[in-house]
């Protein structure tokens, strides 16, 4: 994980977040970049790809039953919100959050995203971590899953970086 202050001192930004984060860092905005690999490790550590594959197995992309998809999307969101991160990952997140110099009120969002999940946090950062997982769960909202099925023919998605910024 990389703070925007570290980025301003010359660390490399993730390529899929570089433009926005470099601008914010140059402006002196405090913040934290959670790399896509952190989300990927969460999915792998919780065996989520297999659980999600089994959950969505009844859905056929060629003939989507939206009535069947809706409760599955809700279950997927709950699965993301309730799956635990590995202890080492949680501690890494808390340490990075402490280094970021963020105020107590933050927004957790994707780079380029217009909206995010708000959090009022205090050390160690549990509320910010919960907001991060709520944001990740948005990828499994009915509309998001339906859009992936329509465009890619699959519910699968790629991990992406996440930003924590002052509100």
Q: What label would you give each PLM region?
A:
Residues 1-166:
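N-terminal beta-alpha lobe that positions the nucleotide/phosphoryl donor
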């Amino acid at each position: 994980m990389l703070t925007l202050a570290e980025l301003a001192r010359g660390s490399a930004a993730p390529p899929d977040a570089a433009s926005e984060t470099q601008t914010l860092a140059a402006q002196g905005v405090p913040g934290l970049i959670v790399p896509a690999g952190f989300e990927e490790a969460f999915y792998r550590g919780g065996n989520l790809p297999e659980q999600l594959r089994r959950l969505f197995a009844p859905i056929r992309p060629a003939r989507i039953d939206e009535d069947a998809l809706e409760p599955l999307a809700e279950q997927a969101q709950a699965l993301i919100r309730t799956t635990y991160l590995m202890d080492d990952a949680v501690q890494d997140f808390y340490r990075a959050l402490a280094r970021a110099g963020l105020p107590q009120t933050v927004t957790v969002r994707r780079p380029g995203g217009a909206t995010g999940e708000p959090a009022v946090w205090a050390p160690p950062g549990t509320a910010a971590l919960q907001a991060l997982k709520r944001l990740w769960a948005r990828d499994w909202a009915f509309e998001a899953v339906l859009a992936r099925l329509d465009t890619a023919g699959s519910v699968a998605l790629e991990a992406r970086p996440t930003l924590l910024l002052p509100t």
